[in-house]
């Protein structure tokens, strides 16, 4: 089975070889291409190329119809009609160039005849910088060199090493790019001073070249292996006692060390001789991570350094902190007796902390008493406490690690903005790039030389004034008037910036708002309430979230317009203040529904409007608008009512509007039994009116006339229209009218004189037949024309007082007619009921005397 398989394999290989030979032969079966002087030429040489057809391989056996074409790669460079073609070619480039000869017949495709490759190159240059090295005591010798320029031809390199006792080692390399060869032999330190010679030779078709011989000894070419097993040890956990350990080969005489902090690019170098694998380092920093590397060498002057060892990373021990904390503070009044102190400080640098800071110690002291009031331990970089507003206070802050504490930083608590003359002037904040703000100011008005330092403070602006917002600050020398702040600066965030000028125990400050980048706010304020206050409205709103403000706000705008109105809205622009969240508006009209909304503005533009709220002012209109016209109307009415003519017309109108129950007539005495029984007596007593008015004596204490009460239901008097006094033509009537005149003035103002005269005459006629005396006439009144009736003759039954003037004598009718003309015609316009009044209750018993009864033309009065 094995013999069969082996035979098949040999047969397969034979077939493949025959096919390749056949293909080679068939490639040029129609002709040949020859190149002279050679297929390999030197750069810049000329070659002759000949293409010839074999017998009977042309076109139809006619040579004139044979067209031979010569191609250089795919480009035609020459052609000829016949059996052969000769062409001379120059200027060939470095490398390989392919030429192909083809036959072209009429009405047929071109037929390939044969081809040839021409190799253009240069002779090898002399190899340079030949060097040999043996890595470690147990390594092998290897050499490197520089080839020079590329020959573009097949080149063979031969490396030869000769040693003592005619020892020779040789190694070849047939790679065109060969520049390294390893002999694979090891030189031993038995003869460290023995010389060895190395040489390399390059050979190709155009020539050869050899390097200069390189002579060296064992110590020259042996490179030690890098040190290994590196470690470090700190004695008593002290950075001042640090020892580095490593391991080396036995023949190493010299070492070099390099080390650096892990965050640094610069190395510290140390050379040590006969270190024997250890070295003490004295300049390391506490609590710092270092990177260590070591290299070795066999001889001080001969040989080469080993490669650097692998890095060792280690952290040094802690030490007591150095430096002092940078402390700043804020003060805020709580009430009349207390204040809040917030302390802030920056972390120490790594070189100052010299370890991990475990905590900070804060000591608050009242300077007057001199004793420590508060001591606190905190792990944060801020601390807040409440102290009295009285007294002088100082604070000290120090940092502590596992080895100790730093020196305390002491500051006196004072009012940083108390001295107005120390306040920096013309403070400005401008954007300086993406995350930087340039703050500039002018020295205070007070002597600038008094300023010891400036402090620039900044923090994110929060509407609520949150004291938990991180505080940032930097200190500047007194001759500086600008500062570039970049720590914790973000785009589209507004910062409250303060510049303090400090001088001893005094300070002055100025503030401004600034941002590194801004654009229009993303939203407007949200109106949460609208209230009415004394004819105006108070609008309250929620502040825009900080992340939507997109920079420092400059103004708020309040817009309003009438609901369902297409007119342009009115607006009110309010300068932005951090603590403001309400604003009054007093230009709205009452009982009109308005739509209100708000926007906010930055230096980049205006935000979209916030929510809309409707509101209608329901309060009273402006009272001055009603008081002023009312006063004017009252003055005009008083002026009108003060005229006599208008008063008379008004009284007539009031009499017409008087209720019906107020104008009920008094019972007429003419209808009484007494008047009907003695009509003759009444007629006999007729006297002229003029005589009655002239000769009427003044009564002196008349006896009361007893009259039975016949008014079972008397209407109460609610209104007393004015009646006039009696006319004063005679002295006898003046005394009788005195009491009645007083009563009339107490009821109302006197009516016009004409009405008084008419009324007086009417009353005289009504009572002309009655005598208010006793039964017998007195002798002192002999001239009295009245008829005297005895008391016994008076009727004992009920009677009525006369009120009908129609029964009077005829000679007095004209007087009655004239009185009727003066009285206004009765018009019943009253809206008051006349039948629902309660009876008038008299307190005079069963009898009503005339001294208790006073009768007027329009009312009955007791």
Curated annotation (Swiss-Prot):
Triggers of expression: In vitro, up-regulated by IFN-alpha.
The protein, known as: Interleukin-12 receptor subunit beta-2
Alphabetical keyword list: Disulfide bond, Glycoprotein, Membrane, Phosphoprotein, Receptor, Repeat, Signal, Transmembrane, Transmembrane helix
Outcome, altering residue 804 to A: No effect on in vitro STAT4 binding to a phosphorylated Y-800 peptide
Phenotype upon changing residue 767 to F: No loss of STAT4 activation. No loss of SOCS3 binding
Tissue: Isoform 2 is expressed at similar levels in both naive and activated T-cells.
Similarity comment text for this entry: Belongs to the type I cytokine receptor family. Type 2 subfamily.
Gene: IL12RB2
Subunit structure: Heterodimer/heterooligomer; disulfide-linked. The functional high affinity IL12 receptor is composed of I12RB1 and IL12RB2. Il12RB2 binds JAK2 (via its N-terminal) through a membrane-proximal region of the cytoplasmic domain. Interaction, in vitro and in vivo, with SOCS3 (via its SH2 domain) inhibits the STAT4-mediated activation. Binds STAT4 through a membrane-distal C-terminal region.
InterPro entries linked to this entry: FN3_dom (IPR003961), FN3_sf (IPR036116), Hematopoietin_rcpt_Gp130_CS (IPR003529), Ig-like_fold (IPR013783), IgC2-like_lig-bd (IPR010457), Type1_Cytokine_Rcpt_Type2 (IPR052672)
Chain location of the short sequence motif WSXWS motif per the record: 305-309
tRNA processing in keyword set: no
Presence of the UniProt keyword Signal in the record: yes
GO molecular function, a single term: cytokine binding
Transmembrane segments: 623-643
Effect of residue 800 to F: Loss of STAT4 activation. Abolishes SOCS3 binding
Compositionally biased intervals (Basic and acidic residues): 728-744
Residues with PTM Phosphotyrosine: 800
Placement of sequence motif Box 1 motif: 662-670
Membrane topology (Extracellular): 24-622
